[in-house]
């Protein structure tokens, strides 16, 4: 590893140190991430030719473009759902059953787990955070709820072919079928969620809150709400056309926006038509900037070969079909995904390991890469998005309350996989 690679690692570590302690230093994590990512690419570019940089930069910007537009579309749809009182409707109807805070905690966790498997972990997290805002008044309860949402979303996404980027990569690479990841991955993934869920439940405090009355959700609103949720389904279906999910998001968002403008200007909700135009302005751009900075930094490490070195160190130079080495490697990679982007690490492993490896080992990689990111809040797209959406949930707060439960869930998931397939 040359001096420039070492310098990149140092900048990356220092950047994350300041991100972790943003409240202590008073500097927003989004600006730190942007500065870190841009600085690392300047170091990478020093001494390189434009021809050599063209393809890596093009690939990095394509990844960032996809995520930014997906996030902008998803956040707009979520804002629209809130605008039409969907989350308030959920609150009122749940409160009618006089469900305790802890029972509600389990119900929402279960919904998040399976919603993530159907949609994806990022979308599910954004939607559930908005629902939780209406259901938990106390900051402590809401933070615990968001922590559990991140863990449940990542666990649910790990057992679905479309729930997480890494499972999509492994599925499209032919490492397992859609049914195999669901059937053989669901039990370890459930364990990765249930153990932290059980631990975090004890931290939920009692809240004496009754559901507030709200406006009835009119038929027109229900139609738009259903159309909004359908947009997330379209984002999954466009994969059949070999298109990235953001195509489905912007397609569905365009249709919903057109219908809103047409129907609201002719119906009873005419007075609210102007508010719809402003929904995009309500998007938390700081969260998106944070994503951009983190992705730039990780792509710089990838271009410099740092991630390949890490993957090679984990598995060795010449990996053969050695179960012990593969299990150890996949488990270690999952732990590293708490700090580094699991996508390039997974991509390196796919290319590195020989063909013919039994699919159950790839199931393990899907589970570890998907759930290992829950150990730190910066380890997954769901965590980073939640960190941007919930200012009170800092890196330190998550580390103090969520990291150990998530780690125990991770260990439990790996142990469950081992008991299922190795004994």
What are these regions (language model features)?
Residues 1, 6-11, 17, 41-42, ...:
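Intrinsically disordered, low-complexity non-transmembrane regions of multi-pass membrane transporters
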């Amino acid at each position: 590893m040359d001096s420039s690679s070492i310098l990149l690692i140092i900048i990356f570590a220092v950047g994350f140190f300041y991100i972790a302690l943003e409240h202590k230093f008073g500097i927003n994590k989004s600006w730190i991430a942007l500065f870190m990512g841009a600085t690392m690419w300047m170091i990478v570019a020093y001494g390189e030719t434009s021809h050599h940089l063209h393809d890596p930069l093009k690939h990095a910007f394509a990844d960032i473009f996809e995520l930014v537009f997906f996030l902008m579309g998803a956040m707009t749809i979520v804002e629209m759902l809130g605008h039409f009182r969907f989350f308030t409707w959920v609150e009122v109807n749940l409160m009618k059953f006089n469900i305790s805070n802890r029972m509600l905690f389990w119900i929402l966790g279960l919904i998040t787990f399976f919603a993530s498997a159907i949609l994806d972990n990022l979308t599910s997290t954004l939607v559930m955070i908005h629902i939780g805002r209406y259901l938990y008044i106390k900051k402590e309860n809401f933070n615990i709820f968001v922590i559990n949402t991140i863990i449940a979303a990542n666990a649910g996404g790990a057992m679905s072919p479309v729930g997480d980027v890494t499972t999509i990569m492994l599925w499209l690479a032919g490492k397992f079928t859609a049914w195999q990841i669901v059937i053989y991955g669901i039990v370890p993934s459930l364990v990765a969620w249930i153990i932290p869920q059980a631990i975090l439940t004890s931290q939920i405090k009692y809240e004496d809150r009754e559901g507030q009355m709200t406006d009835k959700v009119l038929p027109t609103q229900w139609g738009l709400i259903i159309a909004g949720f359908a947009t997330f389904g379209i984002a999954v279906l466009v994969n059949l056309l070999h298109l990235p999910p953001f195509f489905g998001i912007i397609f569905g968002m365009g249709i919903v926006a057109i219908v809103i403008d047409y129907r609201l200007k002719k119906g009873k909700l005419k007075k609210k038509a102007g508010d719809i135009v402003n929904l995009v302005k309500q998007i938390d751009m700081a969260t998106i900037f944070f994503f951009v900075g983190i992705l730039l930094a990780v792509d710089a490490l990838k271009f410099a070969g740092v991630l390949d070195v890490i993957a090679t160190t984990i598995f060795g130079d010449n990996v053969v079909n050695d179960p012990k080495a593969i299990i150890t490697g996949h488990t270690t990679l999952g732990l590293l995904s708490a700090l580094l982007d699991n996508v390039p690490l997974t991509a390196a492993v796919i290319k590195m390991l020989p063909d013919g490896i039994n699919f159950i080992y790839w199931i393990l990689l899907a589970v570890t890469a998907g759930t290992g990111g829950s150990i730190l809040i910066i380890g997954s797209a769901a965590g980073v998005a939640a960190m941007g959406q919930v200012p009170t949930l800092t890196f330190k707060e998550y580390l103090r309350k969520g990291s150990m439960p998530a780690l125990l869930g991770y260990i439990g998931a790996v142990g469950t996989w081992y008991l299922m397939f190795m004994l």
